[in-house]
Curated annotation (Swiss-Prot):
Result, substituting residue 253 to A: In B; does not impair its ability to interact with CACYBP and degrade CTNNB1
Name recorded for this polypeptide: E3 ubiquitin-protein ligase SIAH1
GO MF terms, alphabetically ordered: identical protein binding; ubiquitin conjugating enzyme binding; ubiquitin protein ligase activity; ubiquitin-protein transferase activity; zinc ion binding
Region Disordered, residue ranges: 1-22
Zn finger region (RING-type): 41-76
Annotated disease: Buratti-Harel syndrome: An autosomal dominant neurodevelopmental disorder characterized by hypotonia apparent in early infancy, global developmental delay, delayed walking, language and speech delay, impaired intellectual development, and dysmorphic facial features.
Amino acid sequence: MSRQTATALPTGTSKCPPSQRVPALTGTTASNNDLASLFECPVCFDYVLPPILQCQSGHLVCSNCRPKLTCCPTCRGPLGSIRNLAMEKVANSVLFPCKYASSGCEITLPHTEKADHEELCEFRPYSCPCPGASCKWQGSLDAVMPHLMHQHKSITTLQGEDIVFLATDINLPGAVDWVMMQSCFGFHFMLVLEKQEKYDGHQQFFAIVQLIGTRKQAENFAYRLELNGHRRRLTWEATPRSIHEGIATAIMNSDCLVFDTSIAQLFAENGNLGINVTISMC
């Protein structure tokens, strides 16, 4: 199979855990949704979760909004620091919706699991995956590719599961990122080569692939990065990262293709470095 080659110019210096059911309130008691609505914060409309503090008149406000207020938003009375133990007991019997329910998450779960779930929820907003651009954009997963196509037009996209990622001018000083996109199997993958300069002047390169998709979707693929030339070969194989988790942690832990300047020079041609990239389905 012939490989496509494109030039990448320097750009600049789990799935949701299942809910655990708690004993349901039955008989003449209100439905779970009605009970959960009693815990809505009157300021941000998120949920007031234990420890629950009330004003002198019994009104509630969430822990995020409370430090920003000087009086109760409902009655304008003093906030006070009175624990509402009765509501805390009720909260232990309620299944709360995920804060990203409006984006499509249907999980309901005990308040003790809510924060951990929302940290990993795949319906939370995605950040722009483009490194080195200082882009602050956030949006839904479906909006990521349109954002990249309109706001980061310099990124080249190649079609096919077997391509060559050509990073130009790898001898540029300082920290530099090279980025390109690969489209295959109905998905888009972002290929990143990042050069970091350490405090002692030592430079390292980090190459990694991330899927424009969820963690669950990423588990269906594998990628191989290969430096090949002058009768030498250096290869890395792994599961692509989801843009949900990003690549910063993987690079920090060297969980990617890592090589220093001396290795790069063994494979470079006229200051340009070609990386063979192969995407396969598991």
